[in-house]
Swiss-Prot record:
Origin species: Mycolicibacterium vanbaalenii (strain DSM 7251 / JCM 13017 / BCRC 16820 / KCTC 9966 / NRRL B-24157 / PYR-1) (Mycobacterium vanbaalenii)
Summary of the function given for this chain in its UniProt record: Probably involved in the osmoprotection via the biosynthesis of trehalose and in the production of glycogen and alpha-glucan via the TreS-Pep2 branch involved in the biosynthesis of maltose-1-phosphate (M1P). Catalyzes the transfer of glucose from UDP-glucose (UDP-Glc) to D-glucose 6-phosphate (Glc-6-P) to form trehalose-6-phosphate. Probably also able to use ADP-Glc, CDP-Glc, GDP-Glc and TDP-Glc as glucosyl donors.
Lineage, highest ranks first: Bacteria, Bacillati, Actinomycetota, Actinomycetes, Mycobacteriales
Protein name: Trehalose-6-phosphate synthase
InterPro entries referenced in this protein's UniProt entry, alphabetically: Glyco_trans_20
Pathway: Glycan biosynthesis; trehalose biosynthesis
Length: 491
């Protein structure tokens, strides 16, 4: 069912609107039942805040807590925060279960990540996904000023561009996908494949991390809806593809996302961070080498791969448990989804096995924390670590790899990086590895641990040039310039 258009949709005053599943704040329930809002920092917020303030901008999203229809404390009114208007979209417990945990994270997420876990296709989840996307589109239509620019974010909202186009044809609409876009043969499994492609084609510009995702989308537009598309290769921030859809031309491009690298670089150089890094090394027993993994607890991240590789290197005597430790920081994630619960149990069994085999009383060889880590501690861990392990089976970009590089102004450290991350296309001087080949992962870890100091500095210097030059601000500018049909940022 299509959203209804009408003059009442044209009532907003925001010239620039960001639409995302989550608001850049978290709603917290107090003990007395009232609510407060806490800022939720992130790279996207950092990049877009100045623009939102300058252009009377609004951010539309869910505050993060399920709210049922009879909830007297429900967030329904716009919130003014730091010069931005935040517009909450209310989701009930059923919405969260079926739209978010269901269709978004048990259907789309595994399908888009190479079917590492089998996607589940429930019609009820799809119906809820359509309904929630419609609510986001309607909230946007009521918020955006005449002729405004709207930037829709990520896989949870792939139907919003078309719905919004029907409500507000005056708007300029961009869409960016923050996760990988799958190969054609995998996407074709989706029962609602045509609806998804048509939903995205409501945008004026559809953006992906890498040219490969853009090429896949162009093929699907031809195959599923018979659209005429450009045939040449899509470039990075240049050479856009095109889809002729009705009377409109939709641009398709690749825009690799990044981080606020200058801020991280500055943070890592501070006296407090350097002191905390020394304390971390001391708390770990001052080992000769520290390996580090930092991930959301997700089956795509390859945490089990690196634990197995580490265990086998210890078994084979290629790593000495007396002077090397692995620290795995795992942020809790999607704890009500069955596949995530099973994965956590498996990883924690592996941790117990490694420490049981190779640790000593008071000296575990593998330190595992399953909780959120404060930002200042995380930066100190990056500064302290000799080898960063980033081994996803599939990842749209992986910003942790870039964060580690941004924190290494000393040109120390080494990065072991999966070939199946978007970051691998940019950080070519990392120790690249195929996470499906355990011997290759072991060899990469060993090479990183034993690299000559000058070789390590050469690699880190080259990666830092890339990360510091291509920051999150440049990513946002390149996308929005392309959306406004200005000359794209090259390189």
């Amino acid at each position: 069912m299509a959203p209804q258009s009408g003059p009442e949709a044209r009532s907003g005053g925001a010239d620039f609107v960001v639409v995302a599943n989550r608001l850049p704040i978290d709603m917290v329930r107090r003990a007395d039942g009232t609510t407060e809002f806490k800022r939720s920092p992130g790279g996207l917020v950092t990049a877009l805040e100045p623009l939102l303030r300058r252009r009377h901008g609004a951010w539309i999203g869910w505050p993060g807590v399920p709210e049922d229809a009879d909830d007297p404390n429900a967030a329904t009114e716009p919130i003014e925060q730091d010069g931005m208007t935040l517009v909450p979209v209310r989701l009930s417990s059923e919405d969260v279960a079926e739209y978010y945990e269901g269709f978004s994270n048990a259907t789309l997420w595994p399908l888009y990540h190479d079917v590492i876990v089998k996607p589940i296709y429930h019609r009820e989840w799809w119906d809820r996904y359509v309904d929630v996307n419609r609510r986001f589109a309607e909230a946007t239509a009521h918020t955006a000023a005449e002729g405004a620019t709207v930037w829709v974010q990520d896989y949870q909202l792939q139907l919003v561009p078309k719905m919004l186009r029907m409500l507000r044809p005056d708007l300029t609409i961009g869409f960016f996908l923050h996760i990988p876009f799958p190969p054609v043969e995998l996407f074709m499994q989706m029962p609602w494949r045509t609806e998804i492609i048509e939903g995205l084609l409501g945008a004026d510009l559809v953006g992906f991390h890498l040219p490969g995702g853009a090429q896949n989308f162009l093929i699907l537009a031809r195959r599923l809806i018979g659209a005429t598309t450009s045939r040449g290769n899509v470039g990075v921030r240049s050479r856009f593809g095109e889809v002729q859809f009705g009377f409109r031309t939709v641009k398709v491009g690749a825009f690799p996302i990044s981080i606020d690298s200058a801020e991280l670089d500055q943070h890592a150089r501070s006296r407090a961070t350097r002191q905390r890094a020394k304390e971390i090394r001391a708390e770990l027993g001052n080992p000769r080498k520290i390996l580090l993994g930092v991930d959301r607890l997700d089956y795509t991240k390859g945490i089990d791969v690196r634990l197995r590789a580490f265990s086998e290197l210890l078994e084979e005597g290629r790593i000495d448990p007396e002077d090397t430790v692995l620290v795995q920081l795992a942020t809790p994630s999607r704890e009500r989804v069955e596949s995530y619960v099973a994965m956590r149990e498996d990883i924690e069994r592996q941790v117990g096995h490694v420490n049981g085999e190779f640790g000593e009383v008071g000296h575990p060889v593998l330190h595992y924390l399953h909780r959120p880590i404060p930002r200042e501690d995380l930066v100190a861990f990056f500064v302290a670590a000799d080898v960063m392990l980033v081994t996803p089976l599939r990842d749209g970009m992986n910003l942790v790899a870039k964060e580690y590089v941004a924190c290494r102004h000393d040109l120390g450290g080494a990065l072991v990086l999966s070939e199946f991350t978007g970051a691998a296309a940019e950080l070519r001087q990392a120790y690249l590895t195929n996470p499906h080949h355990i011997e290759g992962v072991k060899d990469a870890i060993e090479a990183a641990l034993t690299q000559a100091p000058e070789e390590g500095r050469r690699r880190m210097r080259a990666m830092r040039r890339q990360v510091l030059a291509h920051d999150v601000d440049r990513w946002a500018r390149s996308f929005l310039d392309a959306l406004a049909s200005k000359e794209p940022v090259e390189g």
